[in-house]
Amino acid sequence: MTIVRVEPTREQTAVRLLLILDRLGDPCAAGDGAPPTAVRVIQAQRKLAKLDFLVRNPDYLADQIITACEQGRLTKERLLDARAVLEEREPELHTYRMLRNRHGAYEPMNNALAVLRHPGLIQVVRAGKSSDTHVRRRDYYLLAAGAEFAQRLRTEVPVLAWYDQQILYVRMVAEGMSAEELKALQYEHAEYAGTPVGQMIAGISERVRARLAAALEREGLA
């Protein structure tokens, strides 16, 4: 039976978001309207949340790897990465389910982001306004100090290697995708789409295990 810890700590979330920005953020420069020392950016909280969802939910990530292999976007050998994500990398110790809001997977990030903002590791910039009271989106910039700190964490805190590798798996299937594209992929799952707003999004581990076993058998990788 899979044991899922429902809620990560503020500090765990902060470190995870820092590594996501470092590995999955788009390169940027001051000439792009970015803060002076910015090196990477993820535009819109929705995209950051969708990427975080894949890091936190190994079953959904493994399923995306299988889909990418079946569509020819990844080689069949990458099915072995799906197996590693789902079965070999202690997913039960690293699964943190997320709530669903009207835009999909969501968790309040302000407290964790504050941990990164106050020492000058990231900067959150409001981009445009849809009205006098509503901001169109928030962009999340990784500053040079944040990139240096992320590298230091990799060197000094070996246990974080799990998250770093997980984020690289996410990059493999999600690089270049917009928030809307990620949302559409996640909504293909009945468990995800059918979760009422405000409720925890259900897991799909057993279904993905069956799908993975069939794919490995079909490709001669079992």
Feature locations, PLM:
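Short amphipathic alpha-helical interaction segments
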Residues: 101-118
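Short, amphipathic alpha-helical interface elements at domain boundaries
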Residues: 1-91, 100
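C-terminal/domain-terminus segments
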Residues: 8, 35-38, 129-152
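Short, amphipathic alpha-helical interaction segments positioned at domain boundaries
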Residues: 138-192
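Long, low-complexity, charge-rich intrinsically disordered regions
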Residues: 172, 184-222
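Alpha-helical scaffold segments in carbohydrate-active enzymes
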Residues: 50-57, 115-118, 145
